[in-house]
Amino acid sequence: MYDTTHRAGAPLTTVPPRGTSHGPGPRYRLVATDLDGTLLRGDATVSPRTLGALRRAKAAGAEHVIVTGRPARGCLPFFTALAYTGLAVCGQGAQIYDAGRGRLLCGTVLDRPAAQATLRRLTARVGQLDLAVVTSGEEAEFVVCDGFCRGDERELAPYRTADRARLWERPVDKVLLRHRTLSDNALTRAALECAEPGLTVVHAGPRIVELLPAGFDKATGLAQVARSLGLTAGDVIAFGDMPNDIPLLRWAGHAVAMANGHPDLKAVADEIAPANDDDGVAEVLERILDIGVLP
């Protein structure tokens, strides 16, 4: 994992704002949180303290919007645990899901020929890849090639196959890439260099590198939700932990990276919160609620 030297009770580390002051003046009306490595603890649960801080923020008049790389269907257990009924940005920004009504409002599909060409080029460069895909729509599932293993596959009713052609039997939202010897950073760089026009690559978590349609990210998805609520970037405080959160944190009025996060994300943050296992989101929300920076 990454730097986890920040522990509960230690002072928060702050870094200079990105050209604009984000002191106690602004009132943040939207709290945007990633799930894995941010709102969720390492055991994929939300702490009572974090639940309490989110309830306080809501009572103060702030909206909470989940912004995650997970497909909407993979978020359902967390919507239940959080009693979450608002709009959620899923699939790295390519899906908007109405949790209250249980409806996928919009989504996109990966360009299959472009994805296949990218994978051929990448395999020629780095050698064998272990692959999985997430199929499109509300009934999304993992289709997983032998050799690929992720702990959260069970949430999307995985179908495992030794035949890579079966990855493409249904429309696909994204491809998950894994290499047995390359680091995540090295695989991400190589995949970006090999990506066909119209595709992009994100490093979404430990051993999670994803091939996605270009033009969508967590910032574009959250901007769409914020507009529907009559809000702008300046109204938003955002929390994340991985490089796929960089667009989100750059867009938001105040950017908070978790202490357990990736160095590239910390470099663009206004503030470093305690780690996800140390109630980092809760600590920041409690502080800004106490000083009146939430409504």
Residue ranges and their predicted role:
Residues 3, 18-30, 46-47, 212, ...:
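Mg2+-dependent phosphoryl-transfer enzymes with acidic/Ser/Thr/Gly-rich catalytic loops
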Residues 15-34, 38-64:
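N-terminal glycine-/serine-/threonine-rich phosphate-binding loop
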Residues 35, 93, 240-242:
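Active-site metal-binding loops of divalent metal-dependent hydrolases
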Residues 37, 57, 68, 92, ...:
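Residue-level signal for inorganic ion chemistry
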Residues 48-150:
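Active-site phosphate-binding/coordination module
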Residues 61-65, 84-86, 174, 234-236, ...:
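Short active-site oxyanion
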Residues 82-85, 91-92, 100, 194-197, ...:
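Short, structured coil segments at secondary-structure junctions
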Residues 125-239, 243-251, 260:
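Conserved acidic, metal-coordinating active-site core of Asp-based
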